[in-house]
Amino acid sequence: MAATTMALSSSSFAGKAVKLSSSSSEITGNGKVTMRKTVTKAKPASSSSPWYGPDRVKYLGPFSGEAPSYLTGEFPSDYGWDTAGLSADPETFAKNRELEVIHCRWAMLGALGCVFPELFARNGIKFGEAVWFKAGAQIFSEGGLDYLGNPSLVHAQSILAIWACQVVLMGAVEGYRVAGGPLGEVIDPLYPGGSFDPLGLAEDPEAFAELKVKEIKNGRLAMFSMFGFFVQAIVTGKGPLENLADHLADPVNNNAWSYATNFVPGK
């Protein structure tokens, strides 16, 4: 008896939420009974959303007269801007879209990781080196590196051991993802839902569609923020909050232009 499984009619998940109904059983030829989730398609997001469809908000940039035909507003944060034609090929577009979402999420986590330790340290909470690009160097100190300043958690003394653990753990996860490992009841690898949505944020299709847009917006800002943190670390040797405090204390002498002029030849 074939399982009553409904396939999604669209390759995207933008503007839609998928709800899992109760499990249905399938009897295989060897007499075993397997269980799988039955997928039903929920009501799509309203077509009046300003973020989706042909009438969505657009930013075409200075070199584009109109949005290309392949950018239809089907996906979140599609503003119709693709002057270089990076999304013209559907397979490349799908890959780049996945990479952007992944990098957005990493950047948002990274930005928090750069700011919060310094914020805690400035408010009297000590847990080791607070400046993000200096924290890892503590492993070369005589006492090694204590995660969160607590030797009872992880006490690291070998950079090679840390590197090996990072390669094994992250490599295994990335390899599993790239190979398209079985995702169980997951419908969309970018927005898996189910156990990955304990707060039920995806239950309302319209709210979920808007949350996708907010995620990409904040993720793009986070990627720019991380780039700024990298440049600040190289130029000033300080953390983001210390740079901000210096700028607020003396904005005339502590700004991007004043630091840039330090690299002028002959100065």
UniProtKB/Swiss-Prot annotation:
Post-translational modification note: Photoregulated by reversible phosphorylation of its threonine residues.
Free-text remark on how the cofactor is bound: Binds at least 14 chlorophylls (8 Chl-a and 6 Chl-b) and carotenoids such as lutein and neoxanthin.
Residues with N2-acetylarginine modification: 36
Ligand binding (chlorophyll a 4): 218
Binding annotation for chlorophyll b 2: 105, 154, 183
Domain of life of the source: Eukaryota
A Pfam family that the UniProt record links to this protein: Chloroa_b-bind
Residues annotated for chlorophyll a 3 binding in this entry: 138, 148, 215
Disordered, as annotated region: 21-47
Descriptive protein name: Chlorophyll a-b binding protein 22R, chloroplastic
Residues holding chlorophyll a 1: 81, 87, 100, 220
Source organism: Petunia sp. (Petunia)
Modified residues (Phosphothreonine): 38
Function: The light-harvesting complex (LHC) functions as a light receptor, it captures and delivers excitation energy to photosystems with which it is closely associated.
Chief localisation class: plastid
Binding site for chlorophyll a 5: 214, 232
Keywords: Acetylation, Chlorophyll, Chloroplast, Chromophore, Magnesium, Membrane, Metal-binding, Phosphoprotein, Photosynthesis, Photosystem I, Photosystem II, Plastid, Thylakoid, Transit peptide, Transmembrane, Transmembrane helix
Residues that bind chlorophyll b 4: 166, 177
